[in-house]
């Protein structure tokens, strides 16, 4: 049966969490948008020239009252534009971006108010803290943060950074789920390491009412992890350049896309792990999450046991990212410098381009 069955529009607000496979899910929805729409499932975009992922990112920024990740003002009007497209659709509509998770109560109230008349569902994917904390630190460094792993973890333990506001399942879902039937609040657990590659997507399909055959095109978008040495080099580069967190689009393509998500991933390097000293804390936090989930009556897709943080495997050792040897960092830095040099050689000289344009214009004037 088509997901569009029934007269009422269903809007699924997929709000995160960050680092839980959201990039993959968004890209797969986008790649299969046409075939999904034929079955009444819509992942709206503004124009064919603007990807759905970028459209939803700008809409989320606008709803949150933020302006970063692009030219000044690039998100202005984004939320209203998305809402207009939602209201033109019937059946199932998906809105997705992970920066929505830590939204203020005012922003959440506006989202619900603007989507009034639709059956609103909240979708939140959760991952065990043993994998989530290292991934969150790496992501913050990719976005320009300069803090050490130790400082990041210290702040996490006190619940202060934006990332943990987005990761603390009870806090997020109490805010977004207020006034919504618990049966319409969906927790999707991220499968453990070694699970079938397609399992997370199958869980999303179950939540969204998608027959997997409606979305045959797979995505190769995966936000791959950096090793300890690679993350440390990016962090020091941020500090040396005094890079502003998340805001400098001019650096984004070079540092984030080319280095942190391109040149420096897939290297043979020690992975970033959660320190063993935080194991008991992570287990206590997880128990708090599980108790909240069971008491709240929200819908769970997946296995709650997936959320339990596993200790380091036997024979596996923790490598402190803050104490990586200079020799290891030098190798990474040389590879990064080589990549930057190749990129600089590939790009045209803007001064030479300007000179050519001036000469061309002068020639036209003489003629």
Annotate each PLM feature.
Residues 1-367:
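Anion-recognition interface
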């Amino acid at each position: 049966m088509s997901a569009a069955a029934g007269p009422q529009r269903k809007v699924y607000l997929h709000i995160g969490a960050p680092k839980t496979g959201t990039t993959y899910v968004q890209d797969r929805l986008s790649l299969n948008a046409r075939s999904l729409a034929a079955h009444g499932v819509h992942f709206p975009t503004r124009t064919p020239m603007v990807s759905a992922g970028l459209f939803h990112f700008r809409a989320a920024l606008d709803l949150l009252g933020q302006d970063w990740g692009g030219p000044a003002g690039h998100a202005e009007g984004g939320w209203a534009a998305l809402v207009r497209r939602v209201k033109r659709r019937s059946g199932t509509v998906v809105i997705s971006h992970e920066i929505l998770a830590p939204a203020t109560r005012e922003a959440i109230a506006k989202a619900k108010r603007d989507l009034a008349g639709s059956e609103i569902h909240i979708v939140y994917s959760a991952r065990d803290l043993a994998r989530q904390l290292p991934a969150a630190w790496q992501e913050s460094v990719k976005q320009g943060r300069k803090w050490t792993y130790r400082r990041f973890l210290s702040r996490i333990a006190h619940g202060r950074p934006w990332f943990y506001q987005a990761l603390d399942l009870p806090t997020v879902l109490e805010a977004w789920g207020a006034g919504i039937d618990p049966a319409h609040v969906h927790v999707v657990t991220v499968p453990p390491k070694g699970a079938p590659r397609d399992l997370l997507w199958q869980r999303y399909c179950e939540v969204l009412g998608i027959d997997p055959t409606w979305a045959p095109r797979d995505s190769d978008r995966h936000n791959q992890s950096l090793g300890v040495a690679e993350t440390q080099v990016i962090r020091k580069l941020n500090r040396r350049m005094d890079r502003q967190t998340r805001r400098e689009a001019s650096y984004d393509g070079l540092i984030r896309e080319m280095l942190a998500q391109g040149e420096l991933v897939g290297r043979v390097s020690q992975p970033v792990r959660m320190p063993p000293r935080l194991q008991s804390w992570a287990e206590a936090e997880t128990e708090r999450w599980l108790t909240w989930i069971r008491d709240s009556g929200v819908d769970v897709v997946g296995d709650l046991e997936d959320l339990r943080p596993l200790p380091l495997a036997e024979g596996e050792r923790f490598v402190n990212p803050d104490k990586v040897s200079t020799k290891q960092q030098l190798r990474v830095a040389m590879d990064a410098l080589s990549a930057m040099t190749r990129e600089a050689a590939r790009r045209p000289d803007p001064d030479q381009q300007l000179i050519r344009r001036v000469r061309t214009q002068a020639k036209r004037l003489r003629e």
